[in-house]
Amino acid sequence: MVSCTIDIRVPVTLKGDEVRKMCEDRLEDENGRIEIHMIGDSLFFPRESPLVNALYKAYVDVTGDTENKPMVIGGGTYAKSLKNIIAFGPEMPGIDYRIHSADEFILVSGMEEAVLVYMEAIKNLLAI
């Protein structure tokens, strides 16, 4: 018997159950089986979403930066377990925070600015 662990990022064009079915069908062709511990849909909101706009407005109002736009990244987040929520973080342009590395960091000034963005974001979200 051979076993392996696979960490799949579900594309925004598919549902988690569709990916599960594709894996099951493929393994069945090879007389294999799959045991899925957790699978869910991807987390994605279009740029025009009121949530994205509220968060982006908070960022622009605090930083004055209109050049950098919201970005979508592939990654896991516990935000997926809640409805109508977006993962929103303090990564500021121009700084390599070495995210998820042994020497990951954030500048104190960056954290202070992020807190101001979060405060503005909460006000904007409450207004939706």
Regions found by a protein language model. Give the residues of each.
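Midchain, well-structured core segments that form catalytic/ion-binding scaffolds
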Residues: 1-24, 40
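Transmembrane helical segments that form the transport core of multi-pass membrane transport proteins
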Residues: 6, 28-33
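Active-site lining segments that contact anionic ligands and/or coordinate catalytic metals
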Residues: 1-3, 29, 83-85
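An extended, acidic, His-containing surface patch that forms the Zn2+-binding/catalytic region
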Residues: 33-128
